[in-house]
Amino acid sequence: IPRIALTQSGGLDATQARSLWQQGFDPKRPMPPVIVSYDSTLYNLSLPNSRNDLLKESLSYLANISGNLSITSETVNHALSSEDMVATWPSDTKEGWWRYRLKGSTLLGHDPADPLKTPVDAAKIQSFYQKWYTPDAMTLIIVGNVDARSVAEQINKTFGELKGKRETPAPVPTLSPLRAEAVSIMTDAVRQDRLSIMWDTPWQPIRESAALLRYWRADLAREALFWHIQQELTKNNAKDIGLGFDCRVLFLRAQCAINVESPNDKLNANLGTVARELAKVRDKGLPEEEFNALVAQKNLELQKLFATYGRTDTDILISQRLRSLQNQVVDIAPEQYQRLRQSFLNSLSVEMLNQDLRQQLSQDMALILLQPKGEPEFNMKDLQATWDSIMAPVTAAATSVETDESHPEVTDIPPVQ
């Protein structure tokens, strides 16, 4: 359907329609005009500043492809013979780690990158389009210097004529819990070994302030942990080890990973180095001076909130808003965010942060090793033994971690180092 949409002018003349898509092709920040995933399709338009006339055309175009797409044998064949500009998320749905993560999931059998079965039946595509492309299931996000009132009027006028309503609820895509095991995966996605110490929990939506404050506390604990390990590695002059931290929500599973990049022959030793620091933090907590430094940094960032917000690119703002919608995170105005965040930082203590860290680091974790294809497979039993020898003596301090640990998204932690 998106390929058909990209070949039609949506009520505009062909030149106007092409120019709208071309605005989205910024060589410095490439964004595909359409991204298809397992449960959603995202159409992207990027317009020049101060061209509100183009905004009106864009809304008209999007409304047309959303409800008035022409689907016939001719338009299908034309789309198939045209350049395919539609991207998928993930970009490589066949990559080894992603296929491993999908095991036991409801997503299996719904690969957005699967090749079309030929011959293509236009009538079936039309039926799918009418069933799922309904206005009650659409979300429109506009970011930029626009007049909110006039844009709202344009939206109501342009999209108000669309017909149709979902009769069948869309199935909710979910991932299975991540198994706490040691696994080696051969992949083209890495050039050297990358070991991920990974844990996940069910994701809980954030709909009120108490849940938001719990999430912030858990997230700040993770950030404190990341910087502590990074500083310890630097202080000890650790060689041949790269450290990254990645937290995200994937289809109702909240997933965090400490990523260790290492030469193959030093992998076991480097895992031991990181595990010893994790065990030390779990058992003894972070020193108060590190806590104070982190809170001071967060207070400084909060003072610069509006300046940072004003400099943030529109595609990043849209990505943040999309994540909030997908993960059912309540929308907060910047002013309210600033007040809540300041109150949170003022009330936080090192004891609260260390309790969160103890909970998070007391979970069963998976060891996921990504290896470049062609490399001999690493003996994962050795890595598991190293990990267990350091991390196994866990006290019964934290049995339930889902309350605080279930919100690792929209994080301040840098995704890669």
Task: Put a short name on every predicted segment.
Residues 19-128, 174, 181, 272-276, ...:
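Acidic/histidine-enriched segments that form metal/cofactor-coordinating
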Residues 2-9, 41-52, 63-73, 85, ...:
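Second-shell loop/turn segments in exported
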Residues 2-11, 25-26, 48, 60-71, ...:
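Sec-exported extracytoplasmic/periplasmic mature domains
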Residues 39, 133-135, 195-207, 249-256, ...:
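Short acidic (Asp/Glu) and glycine-rich catalytic loops that position anionic groups and cofactors
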